[in-house]
Amino acid sequence: NIVDSTSIERNLYLTTQLLELGTPMVIAMNMIDVSRKNGDKIDMKKLSAALGVEIVETSALKGEGSVKAAEKAAAAAKNRTTGEHPHVFTGSVEHALAHIEDLIGGKVDPRFLRWYAVKLFERDEKVVAELKLSEDVKKGIEEAVSSCEKEMDDDAESIITNQRYAYINTLMQNAVKKGKAKGSLSVSDKIDRVVTNRVLALPIFALI
């Protein structure tokens, strides 16, 4: 999993999704030379411990760390090494996901149990059709999701998105210190702020 260290927040969002697949992973923290030049400080040990995966610093432009990252990835795949799932979700959302896991236990590969639970929480139609769940199980899932939506006054997909970003924000506070002056954003950061804005994102994509 290649992570752009200069846009780490956006990249970590995808990382949280990939971790739910239960696939052996090594993170290649790319463009680390640019991050250092910007004065950014990333505590790789803290980040690695929190995510449960090994992190290798790389610079594709300078050809640094790529071989080591590839070797680590090959070793992880060979040994089927997977870390524990990070605690991305909390409170009633985690409770609902755990309940969904109980409802579908035995129906899916245990490695992918959390991924399926999240997709069912989001009411992913393709996943629902794929699993061919009984009406009783579907009802139990819907009750768990609806209860969360009512408690949090939001829709299921937004709840998942918001909790991912809340988790990433905690990671950033604990393991990442930006070198730029407070309030100074890179071009990439500015673009991220706009395209991930819940109000502006849809009109922007509609125009594209």
PLM feature spans:
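Conserved Switch II/interswitch segment of TRAFAC-class P-loop GTPases
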Residues: N1-T15, L19-K41
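Alpha-helical transmembrane helix bundles of large polytopic membrane transport and channel proteins
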Residues: V26, R36-A181
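Core alpha-helical transmembrane segments of integral membrane proteins
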Residues: V194-I208
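Residue-level signature of catalytic and energy-coupling elements of molecular machines
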Residues: L18, N30, L47, A117, ...
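Cytosolic juxtamembrane amphipathic/interface segments immediately preceding
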Residues: K177-R193
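Short flexible coil/turn linkers enriched for glycine and charged/polar residues
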Residues: L21, A49, L185, N197-A201
